[in-house]
Structures are given as structure tokens and as C-alpha cells.
A protein has these predicted regions:
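Transmembrane and membrane-interface helices of multi-pass
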Residues: 1-250
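Membrane-interface soluble catalytic domains
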Residues: 2-53, 59-76, 94-97, 102, ...
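Short, solvent-exposed loop/turn segments at the edges of secondary structure
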Residues: 341-342, 531-533
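SF2 helicase/translocase ATPase core recognition
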Residues: 534-540
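Flexible glycine/proline-enriched surface loops and loop-helix/loop-strand junctions
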Residues: 349-350, 408-411, 474-475, 550-556
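Active-site-proximal alpha/beta segments of enzymes that process anionic O-linked groups
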Residues: 228-466, 564-595
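A long, amphipathic alpha-helix that forms part
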Residues: 117, 423-428, 464-506, 538, ...
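Active-site metal-binding loops of divalent metal-dependent hydrolases
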Residues: 299, 511-512
Length: 624
């Protein structure tokens, strides 16, 4: 039977295999893809794949290359199954992939395979074909790596690779990546995954040796035809890969990072011009004097703070401060996003979830304070440099005085010093200058939590250190200890702010919260409201309270109102009296014109309504 097929029926084989494989791919595309997209275009891609699959199969039949045929089919099966990973996981990750999306995922590895096979037909001699195989195997390895990453990321987060994940990666470095791996991925699992990746790639490379063969003697006309086929396959491969989810995600991430970099350049240009901007200066110069301190926490969720009702006493200073009438603690504060750069670029600028101002056109609180004649100081324990820090670093770099205590270039959350190192820098600020804005950026509770506090004096939890703890509990204990240390640092900062600088107002909030579990973090793809639950409190001096009784009364009256930290810019502008330009009173938390409530307040850049946080707010919450 086989000899009959090879001798006389190879055309029938080509037709049968083409139709059968087309039917299988069509069915898979229909089952896994949601309605939508250009269905006819999807069908054309699938048919061309089936046609090539049938053609190569028929050729191997005709030449009686049984091992090559079996190896080829095994390779097609392996790559085909890998191509289904994203479409299969998509519904579980609540991601919609239509039939066109699914067809691009299915087509990419098969066009990669057919490109390699066709190229080998054009290269004479075993050495040339081996070179083609090796190059092809490298691309297969990279493709397998992408698919394994899909599986691993889904296993950790129950989500597909997304722009959120890529932006988090862009804000990550080798040190932080190793920390994340050590916390979230057991070493054995990681070793097995890497071994499986290389084993699969190596097996595909080995079996490809059987079918990376072609006609020994190819006529000029045939060779031209093969060249045209190869050109088509390369073009199809590039196009199909560019439309896959991973490629689209990378492209969107690049656009976002590009916008951050553009913002950085805009801030740097504005830094040189804002002081000489007579329009701004004339509008703002009448603002009253005052010393204002803004403290920005890191990864601190109010759900793990004793002052907000958490059962552990890990905020002794803040708990005591909450009883002092000079402090106002706000119970329902949220961050605008779950990641630092996204959150703080909104918190420190005009841009917020409730307006349409492009980020590149948004003035920062530093710009406005400097234009009004305030001396500005930036004191930070976070990295200044690196792609992930450029927007925040650019804002801080506009200050008159800068103290960047984290001198690791591009290392994000790696620091050799605890946050208490910032206090001596604050003590150096001249208290005689009564027109100042000082921003302090803490390292706070960023993972790994155990690196954020000195164990001497702050390793309080667990209270009973003889008991065996679950991995969840270990993380909770370490996080709570870091919160305890942040509370201590805040007490030191407030001591200097009140007794040395005689500050008129001190505002504290965290950039975002944290989900504290065995696998902790603030990944937007795993969104839970705890990731955006943040502490927010304000200290006002008795003198400030006398000068601004209406604002002080509004603070006390609104302590249970909803607030998102992207309104910090307008709120601080209002407190400083910078209300004549680049100011929106509807986003000033203490303004009479403040118009935000549960009906219109959001988080995650306007994608999630706060009213969905039923666990924290209940079903009948109102500003009262």
C-alpha cells in the first residue's frame, strides 16, 4: 500500500492531508477562538498552512522517507500543541481571543517549521543544512520559551502575559527578579521547567535531522519556485508573529515606556523654563508662605496597619498620632494603580483618572512650587536611574536640592540602607526658609520584606517564634515587621518636621498597596482591592489650622470619604494656596467644589469602580 502511494498516489495524499489538516485546524480555531476578527483571513492562513503541510507530507511519502515522515508529523504535533497554549488559557484568564487572534497563534510555529524545511532544500551539502537546522532550532527554543512562560505566568497569576506584566518587568531588574523568583517559584519547579524547555527543544532539533532534506538535484526552475515559496513563508512568519499576543503586548509596552520617556524629556525641558515663566510666576507668587512635607510610602496597604484596625499593633506611632487632633487619618484612600510609576506619575502631576490632560503636558507639583518661589527638596531611598524610574526620577530631578540615597544605577529596589538614612538629610534642610516643599520617598515595604527593616528591634512577629509557620504566615510576619519599621521612620521624620522645620503641613500616602500572601505582590493582572488600599493621613500645625479653618474643618468632616491618590496634586496645590492656575478644585479633597463620590470614583486608571469594593465599603456607602 505504501509503495502504491509513493509511486502513483502522492497527489491524492497531498489532497487528503491538506483537507484533513485544514478541517482539524478549522475546528480548533472555531472551538478556541471567540467570534470576531476577519474570519475569511483566518481561513486563508489555515488553508495555506494545510496546503504546505500536505505538500511536504506527500513529498516524504513519494520519496519513501518513513523516518522523515514520522519525525515531521511529530514535530508538527509538538509545535501545534504549543501554539494552542495561549488560546486554551485565555478563557480561564478572562481574556478574549477571537478566531483571527487564534489563527495567528496557530500559524506562527508552523510557518517557522515550514520556513526551516524549505530553506534546507535550497542549501547544498550537509554542513549548510546543519547550519540551517541550528539556526532554526534557536528560533524554536525561543518560541518554546515564550510558551513555557505563558504556562508559568498563568500558574502564578491565573492571567496571560499582558502589558501590566511587561511594565512591571520594565520596572524590575536582575536583583528584584531574583527576589521574585526566590519568593514565588520553588527551586525544583524552576529547574524542572528549564530542563523540560531544553529537552523539548533538543528533541525537536534531533528529529528535524530526518526531514531537513530535499531534492539532491534541483533544476533552476524548481529552485526559483522554492525561493519564491521561502520568501512567502518568511513574510508570513514575520507577519503572523507580529500579530500574536506576545508581540502585540511587547509593542504596546514599548509605546507606554516611550510615553514615559517622552514625559521625562518634557520634564527636563520644563525644569529649565518654569522658573522663567512669568505667566506662571505672576499667577502663583501671591500664594502664602509655608513649609510643606510630602512623604510617599512604598507598597504599604492599610489592611496590614494597626491604626486602620488590623489586629496587630505594628503602627504604635501612627496609632497614637490618630488620637492627636493635629493629625487626620482618612479611612478610604485608594491608589490609582498597583504599580509605582503609573501611580506616582498621576499623584505628582496634573494628570489623573478624571481628566483628559496628556501626561506629557501635565505640570508636576514640583514645577508649580518652584514657579511660586518655593524651595524644593527631594529626598529618596529609591533608585534615580533606569527605564522604570525615569518619570519619577525626572520629577525629582526638577527640585532645587536632591538627595538620592540609593546610588545603585538601574537597580530599582536594591538598596544598602534602610529608610532611616533619609532622616539626617531632612535635618539638613534650612528651617529659616519659610517657603519650602520637601518630598520624601521611602523604600517602605517593597519585597523582599525582610530586607526592608533592621532585625534588631523590629523583628517583632511572630510573637511566638517557636511555632512552625506556613509560608503565608511567614510572608505576613515579615511584611508586618516592615510596616512596624516604616512606622518608626515616620515617627522620626515627624519629629524633625514638627520640631526642627516647624512644618505647616505634612501629607503621607503610599504609592500603592500590597497583596500579602505566600506569593505576595501588586500585579495588576491579579488585581485585588488590597493592592490599592493605601494609608493616607495629614498633619497640620496649630498655626495652619488657625489660618485655614475651613480646610481644617473639611479634613475632619471628610475623613471617611473616598480618595484616590491621583488627586494628591490638586489637594496639595490647594493646601499650599497655589489655586490660580493649573489647579482643579473638583479634585482637591478639601475644596468646596470637590465632586467625587462613590458614583464616579475609580482605580486602575479608570478601569475599576471603587463601588465594587463591597468588602471595604459595603453596599450602601455614601460620603458622610
Amino acid at each position: 500500500m505504501f509503495s502504491f502511494i509513493t509511486d502513483r498516489g502522492w497527489k491524492a495524499v497531498w489532497t487528503a492531508v491538506t483537507l484533513a489538516s485544514f478541517a482539524v485546524m478549522f475546528a480548533l480555531n472555531f472551538l478556541l477562538g471567540s467570534p470576531g476578527g476577519l474570519v475569511w483571513w483566518s481561513m486563508i492562513k489555515i488553508f495555506l498552512l494545510a496546503l504546505q503541510f500536505g505538500g511536504i507530507t506527500a513529498y516524504l511519502f513519494r520519496k519513501n522517507l518513513k523516518k522523515a515522515l514520522v519525525s515531521f508529523w511529530i514535530t508538527v504535533l509538538c509545535l501545534g500543541l504549543l501554539s494552542l497554549i495561549a488560546p486554551v488559557l485565555a478563557p480561564f484568564a478572562k481574556v478574549v481571543m477571537n478566531t483571527e487572534d487564534t489563527s495567528f497563534e496557530m500559524a506562527t510555529p508552523l510557518f517557522l517549521l515550514f520556513t526551516g524545511v524549505t530553506a534546507s532544500w535550497l542549501i547544498p551539502g550537509p554542513k549548510g543544512r546543519m547550519a540551517v537546522r541550528i539556526l532554526w532550532a534557536v528560533f524554536v527554543l525561543l518560541y518554546c520559551l515564550i510558551q513555557f512562560t505563558y504556562i508559568g505566568y498563568f500558574g502564578l497569576t491565573h492571567a496571560l502575559i499582558s502589558v501590566n506584566m511587561m511594565l512591571a518587568l520594565a520596572q524590575t531588574n536582575l536583583h528584584e527578579a531574583l527576589e521574585y523568583i526566590s519568593v514565588n517559584i520553588p527551586l525544583l519547579n524552576l529547574v524542572l521547567a528549564v530542563a523540560a524547555l531544553f529537552a523539548l527543544s533538543y528533541i525537536i532539533f534531533l528529529v528535524s535531522g530526518y526531514f531537513f532534506v530535499g531534492p539532491r538535484d534541483v533544476s533552476g526552475r524548481t529552485k526559483k519556485g522554492i525561493v519564491l515559496i521561502l520568501i512567502f513563508e518568511v513574510a508570513a512568519l514575520i507577519f503572523c508573529f507580529s500579530q500574536t499576543r506576545i508581540a502585540q503586548t511587547v509593542a504596546q509596552t514599548q509605546d507606554t515606556v516611550k510615553s514615559f520617556i517622552e514625559y521625562q524629556h518634557m520634564v527636563e525641558e520644563r525644569r529649565h523654563n518654569v522658573i522663567n515663566n512669568k505667566h506662571l510666576s505672576n499667577k502663583l507668587k501671591h500664594a502664602p508662605d509655608g513649609v510643606y512635607v510630602l512623604i510617599i510610602g512604598e507598597s504599604e496597604t492599610r489592611d496590614h496597619m494597626g491604626v486602620y484596625g488590623y489586629p496587630r499593633d505594628n503602627t504604635p506611632f501612627e496609632t497614637e498620632a490618630a488620637e492627636n487632633k493635629d493629625y487626620t487619618f482618612f479611612t478610604h484612600a485608594y491608589s490609582s494603580y498597583t504599580q509605582t510609576v503609573q501611580s506616582l506619575t498621576y499623584a505628582l502631576t496634573q494628570k489623573n483618572q478624571y481628566n483628559k490632560i496628556p501626561l506629557v503636558d501635565a505640570y508636576s507639583i514640583i514645577d508649580m512650587a518652584r514657579a511660586a518661589g518655593f524651595r524644593t527638596t527631594w529626598i529618596s531611598n529609591q533608585s534615580r536611574f533606569g527605564i522604570w524610574d525615569t518619570p519619577i526620577g525626572a520629577i525629582g530631578s526638577a527640585c532645587d536640592d536632591q538627595h538620592w540615597m540609593n546610588d545603585y544605577i538601574g537597580t530599582g529596589v536594591q538598596t544598602k540602607d534602610y529608610d532611616s538614612i533619609l532622616v539626617p538629610q531632612l535635618q539638613k534642610v534650612d528651617p529659616n526658609n519659610r517657603r519650602q516643599l520637601i518630598v520624601i520617598h521611602l523604600m517602605g515595604s517593597h519585597v523582599s520584606y525582610w530586607d526592608r527593616y533592621p532585625h534588631a528591634g523590629f523583628y517583632k512577629y511572630p510573637l511566638d517564634q517557636s511555632k512552625t509557620r506556613s509560608k503565608d504566615q511567614v510572608m505576613i510576619d515579615e511584611y508586618d515587621n516592615s510596616v512596624l519599621y516604616t512606622d518608626h521612620v515616620l515617627s522620626e521624620i515627624m519629629n524633625v518636621a514638627i520640631n526642627h522645620l516647624h512644618a505647616d503641613e505634612v501629607m503621607y500616602f503610599s504609592d500603592h498597596g500590597e497583596l500579602v500572601t505566600q506569593n505576595p505582590g501588586h500585579n495588576a493582572d491579579q488585581f485585588e482591592f488590597q493592592m490599592v488600599h493605601i494609608p493616607f493621613w495629614i498633619y497640620t500645625s496649630p498655626e495652619y489650622q488657625k489660618k485655614h479653618p475651613a480646610e481644617f474643618a473639611a479634613m475632619k468632616r471628610r475623613k471617611n470619604w473616598l480618595f484616590t491618590n491621583d488627586m494628591a496634586y490638586d489637594t496639595l496645590m490647594g493646601s499650599m494656596g497655589l489655586t490660580s492656575v493649573k489647579y482643579d478644585p473638583t479634585c482637591d479633597f478639601f475644596s468646596r467644589k470637590y465632586d467625587k463620590d462613590i458614583t464616579n470614583m475609580m482605580t486602575m486608571y479608570g478601569n475599576i469602580w471603587l463601588r465594587k469594593d463591597v468588602k471595604a465599603l459595603g453596599t450602601n456607602y455614601k460620603n458622610q
